[in-house]
A protein has these predicted regions:
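Basic, Lys/Arg-enriched alpha-helical interface segments
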Residues: 1-63, 71-76, 86-99
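Catalytic Cys-His active-site segments of thiol-dependent hydrolases/isopeptidases
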Residues: 79-83
Length: 99
């Protein structure tokens, strides 16, 4: 799959250095994947879940949440947000018009 907005991962990694390796691992795996549906995603990331129109990944043992828009037909992943668990729990990201 083609990952769009990788800059969001890099920027988050700069302010949360302990996330860098886990985010890079997710990027490496996801960019080589050919997922067709959430079940395919969950074979690699069992805790990935669909929330609204987004897919949410637990990163670094659930310390961070990666929120993406997976478009299976075009094989694209649009990175929307990377949040700490506390930021995720505030649900402000759910104000995204695409949610």
């Amino acid at each position: 799959m083609r990952v769009i907005s990788r800059k969001i991962l890099r920027d988050f990694g700069e302010s949360h250095a302990d996330s860098c390796d886990a985010l890079y691992d997710w990027y490496r795996v996801s960019s080589k994947a050919e997922w067709q549906n959430l079940i395919d995603v969950q074979q690699i990331y069992p805790k990935a879940e669909s929330v609204g129109n987004f897919t949410v990944f637990n990163i670094k043992g659930n310390r961070y949440r990666l929120i993406v828009d997976l478009v299976y037909v075009s094989q694209r992943i649009y990175i929307k947000y990377v949040l700490t668990h506390a930021e995720y729990d505030k649900d402000e990201w759910k104000n995204d018009p695409y949610f």
